Amino acid sequence: MKSIMVKYTELPREETIYIGGMFPVGKVSAVVANGGVGKSWCVLLASLSITKGVRFLPNEEYPVWNDKDVMVIDTENRAKTFCERVILAGGSLERYYVPGEDICSAITYFDKRDKESIEEEIQDPNTMMVIVDSLAGFNGGIDENTVAASESIKWLGRLAQKYNKAVVLTHFLNKSEVTNRINTENMRGHSSCQQYMELIWAIDKDKGSEKIKRLYQIKNNITEIDDTVYRFKLTEASAEFLVTPTAEETSLKEKRAKIFEANIDKSDKEIAELILIEEPTSYLHNLVAWVKRRRKG
């Protein structure tokens, strides 16, 4: 059990640091996916970049440490599993702790005293990251469309900004696919909390393999999926990234480019509809976003 009382002093604000290349310090971010895809595992592996000095995302430039701490607010009754995974991944249990509880316990209900305890311990200068697994559990099982979820994001966001910590939420996405419409109301709640939610990562299964996952960065406007897609296999103790695009993916990009160039004078939606004929499993709003980015160069 870890309980450290320190006097808080304002930390210097420099260029944003991204833990594991994914999670900005001083902001709230999230990983969303369907059940069993690997949200918690993904967040844990990314956190090893500050507790063990192991890089997560490939081909990305970001600093690493091997002596920073991670606070785990576990609401899924899985802190013991999280503990086992830390060991499996070769991390140190001394670097992971649940506020006010043993690492193998779990907080299942948050009242005023729990939040006071969290704020006391988050001030520890060695704590760099706070994992909230999950957003729904943190709100007592309430989904993301409620005022309670919005208020929780704002509360966590204020802590992230005040104490310069990376706060990461996991959230079960109740959708047929991650790339389905993810609107502003779903993860950001009211507009007043948008200043705290920096970005969202989404994971889904690769259509060609049950073992391969796809990791997307969802842009700030929420409906736009980033072109950058990381494909990886979750192994027993790590993630094996597949940085080389498949022939099918390369061919798909070439087809899109040809359709765009041949119809450049048409509207964004018209071009997207032509691409949709070749990609019937895609979503029109994502294709429109792709055309807009293509026009900007």
Where are these regions (language model features)?
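The Walker A/P-loop phosphate-binding site
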Residues: 1-92
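Short gly/ser/thr-rich secondary-structure transition/capping motifs
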Residues: 9-17, 112-113, 181-185
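Conserved inter-motif catalytic segment of the P-loop NTP-binding fold
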Residues: 19, 63-147, 151
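Phosphate-binding/switch region of NTP-binding enzymes
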Residues: 30-31, 36, 40-41, 63, ...
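A structural alpha-helix within SAM-dependent methyltransferase catalytic domains
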Residues: 44, 48, 119-122, 157, ...
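Conserved, well-folded catalytic cores of nucleic-acid-processing
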Residues: 50-53, 89, 138, 176, ...
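C-terminal regions of RecA-like/P-loop NTPase motor modules
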Residues: 65, 123-126, 161-162, 207-297
